[in-house]
Amino acid sequence: MPALRSVLLLCWRDIGHPQGGGSEAYLQRVGAQLAASGIAVTLRTARSPGAPRREVVDGVRIDRAGGRYSVYVWALLAMAAARIGLGPLRRVRPDVVVDTQNGLPFLARLVYGRRVVVLVHHCHRAQWPVAGPVLGRIGWFVESRLSPRLNRRNQYVTVSLPSARDLVALGVRNEQIAVVRNGLDEAPASSLSGPRSGAPRVVVLSRLVPHKQIEDALEAVAALRPQIPGLHLDIVGDGWWRQRLVDHVRRLGMSDAVTFHGHVDDVTKHHVLQSSWVHVLPSRKEGWGLAVVEAAQHAVPTIGYRCAGGLSDSIVDGVTGLLVDSHAELVDRLERLLRDPVLRDQLGAKAQTRSGEFSWTQSADAMASVLHAVQVGEFVSGVV
C-alpha cells in the first residue's frame, strides 16, 4: 500500500473561528494526529476577522479565505488553480481530500474525483429554515439531492450510526459510509478532584445558536425552581443567539438563576462541569454530541432528545444518561435526576467509565485507515 503523504482538509470554519464548535474540533484534532504521524496536512477554511491568512496549528497548515458562504467559492477556485500550479494551494499535492459538508459541500469531487472523502457530521434538514425560505430550500436541495448524486462514487465518513442512517435515507449507499467516532481531550487533572456543588446546578455546554434549543433548558429550570430551591443553570459557550437567550431569561424572571459563562478556556470549562449535577443538551440535531462525553469525564450524566440523532449513540439511554421525546419529559427526567442522588451517581459513574473508550489517537487511526483505502480505490463501511 502506498504511503499517505499529503491530505487536504476542507471546512467552513476552523477551531479558532468565533463560531467554531464540535465539528471543527473533530477536524483539527484528527488533523493534528495525522500531522504528528508524518503526513502533510493542510486545512482550507474561512477567514474570520482578525485571523491570520495562514498559520500552523498543532502541525496543521491552515489557509484561510472567504466568509460564511464565499469560503466555498474561494476554496473551489483555489483547488482548481492548484491543479495548474497556481494559487495558495499550488504546493499542496493531496493524496486524499476531506470535504467537510456542514450543510453544503465544497464540490471537491469536481477537481479531485474519487480521491475525495465526504465528511458529514449530521444532516441539516432541521437547520436550513433558519437561513430563510429561499436559501433554506436551495441549501436543502444541495445537501439532500445534488451532493449525494455528485458524490455517489465517493467514500463518506460520519461520526455516529444515526447519522449514517440519515445518509442512507438521502440515497448514499451503506457500503460507502464509514463511522469514525469523536475522540476526547483528557480533562485537566486538577478539575477532576474538585467538589460537586452543594446546591443543585445544571449545565449546558453548547454553541448558542437556534438549533441547539437552549430555551428548552431555560424553561425546564424555570419550571423546576419552585420545587427545587437554589437550582442554578450554567451555560458554557457562546454564539450569535446569545442576546436572544439573555432576553428570554429576563422574561422568565430568573436572571439570578442563570450564568452565561461565554467562551472559556478548557480548565474553566472542566471546573464548571465538575461542579455540576446534570448536563442538559436540548439540541434538535447532533452528529454525536462531544459535550456528552466531556461531561461524562466528570461523572455528570446527560439528558438529551432522542430525535437529535447522534445523541442515541453518545448517550446509552438509562445507562450513561437519559433520552427523552418531549420537553415535558425533559422537565420530568431532570427533576428525577436532581432529586435522586443514587440514580444520578449510577448514571454518572457509568458515563465516566464509557468516556475512557474514546481518544483522538483512536479516531485519527480510524480516519487514516479510511484515507488509505480511498487512496487505493477501495471503500470502507461500518464503525471503524
Where are these regions (language model features)?
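Membrane-proximal helix-turn-helix segments that form the acceptor-binding/catalytic region
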Residues: 134-157, 165
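Short hydrophobic beta-strand element within catalytic cores of glycosyltransferases
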Residues: 301-305, 315
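Carbohydrate-associated surface elements
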Residues: 162, 183
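Aromatic "clamp/platform" in nucleotide-sugar-dependent glycosyltransferases that forms part
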Residues: 284
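Conserved acidic donor-binding segment of nucleotide-sugar-dependent glycosyltransferases
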Residues: 316-328, 336-342
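A short, well-ordered alpha-helix in the C-terminal region of glycosyltransferases
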Residues: 230, 343-357, 366
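Conserved donor-binding/catalytic core segment of Leloir-type glycosyltransferases
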Residues: 157, 193-221, 234
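Nucleotide-activated donor-binding/catalytic signature segment of Leloir-type glycosyltransferases, i.e.
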Residues: 246-264
